[in-house]
Amino acid sequence: MTKKKILVLSDHPLSPSGVGTQTKYMIEALLKTGRYQFICLGGAVKHENYTPQKVDPWGDDFRIFPVDGYGNHEIIRSVLQKERPDALWFMTDPRFYGWLWEIENEVRANLPMVYYHVWDNFPPPKFNADFYNSNDVVACISKVTHEILKTVAPEVESHYLPHAVNETY
């Protein structure tokens, strides 16, 4: 069986941020199925160490490349060409991904863009419509977000997919 390769853009999955921990929980749950591999651009304002990591016990199936911010056009183009991922999954506030949506036609010609998103208050942010419409799927972390998506960008496929929870804690 060939594993699906997912390119992930988010906070560094081993960081203690909410975005980082949610990303890690999602990745680990999918790795346990044996059907996926993850190449992560682990975002931060600045890293102390930019050495790529293979996360134990997953090895080549869970690789992290530390990046400043969440990446840029050149990094995405390079990763798409070298790694040939099957999907792009990304998470954090939309204001950090304007650069990505600038090249969404380029990206979406090769693989679907899945945005894991939360916007927790009304009124619906109509100013985000272009961002929402630049994805193949928006996975909504809250029911409020899902209602907002159905209002602001009804033509975009969206699903309610709440935060992951580590059952150990």
Region annotations inferred by a language model:
Residues 90, 140-141:
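Short beta-strand scaffold positions
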Residues 77-97, 112-115:
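Short N-terminal targeting/anchoring amphipathic segment
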Residues 108, 125-137:
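A conserved, positively charged/aromatic
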Residues 144, 164:
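Carbohydrate-associated surface elements
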Residues 48-75:
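Conserved nucleotide-sugar phosphate-binding/catalytic loop shared by glycosyltransferases and other
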Residues 110-112, 137, 157:
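Proline-centered loop/turn at the N-terminus of a beta-strand
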Residues 41, 67, 161:
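Hydrophobic residues at beta-strand termini and immediately following loops
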